Amino acid sequence: MYYAEPIARLIEELTKLPGIGPKTAQRLAFHILHMEPSVVEGIARTLVEARAKVKYCSVCCNLTDQDPCQICADDGRDHSTICVVQEPRDVVAMEKTREYHGVYHVLHGALNPMEGIGIDDIRVKELVARLGDGRVQEVILCTNPNTEGETTAMYIARYIKPLGVKVTRIARGLPMGGDLEYADEVTLAKALEGRREI
């Protein structure tokens, strides 16, 4: 199909986003081209600004525009409990429950030997470093209930258990193979409430 070169490039760039195939990219491209120029410029500016200003929190590895992030800097949170999640969007899902008042640690992935993702590719060393001061009493493993998430949780549990920290895993109730970000707040709250020691 023939497109003007700028349209073809826009479609190609949009397909680099997760979940955006060629047809969706084409629809988005034509929609963008029909938008007011000021709106398109605003979106472009916001993308560039977010990419430039958002970084990793030096404590929990979550995405933030301040360091430490708002959660880590909050003295009202329970800093003796760390909830370990795979992705930043999982922090958002857990916060929506309004049941968890501790702090987080974001791994930015899960172990997946088939895809070459090993322990050095996720933020486990940073987690272990946080446990060194004796302040943390419990680590709640909230990785996704799929093969990669379960493998990651078991590895982390075995790795940090000798440090004398209580290690728990969120309860079932989340569908096997699902992602935390898609679970509703009530299910997540119940899974957190029913966590078990491993």
Swiss-Prot record:
InterPro entries per the UniProt record, alphabetical: DNA_Rcmb_RecR (IPR000093), Hlx-hairpin-Hlx_DNA-bd_motif (IPR003583), Rcmb_RecR (IPR023627), Rcmb_RecR_Znf (IPR015967), TOPRIM_dom (IPR006171), TOPRIM_RecR (IPR034137)
UniProt entry tagged with the keyword Zinc-finger: yes
Zn-finger segments (C4-type): 57-72
CDD domains given in the database record: TOPRIM_recR (cd01025)
Pfam families: RecR_C (PF21175), RecR_HhH (PF21176), RecR_ZnF (PF02132), Toprim_4 (PF13662)
SMART domains: HhH1, TOPRIM
Annotated GO MF terms: DNA binding; zinc ion binding
Keyword annotations: DNA damage, DNA recombination, DNA repair, Metal-binding, Zinc, Zinc-finger
PROSITE patterns on file: RECR, TOPRIM
Single GO biological process annotation from the record: DNA repair
Protein role: May play a role in DNA repair. It seems to be involved in an RecBC-independent recombinational process of DNA repair. It may act with RecF and RecO.
Family: Belongs to the RecR family.
Name of the protein in question: Recombination protein RecR
Organism expressing this protein natively: Symbiobacterium thermophilum (strain DSM 24528 / JCM 14929 / IAM 14863 / T)
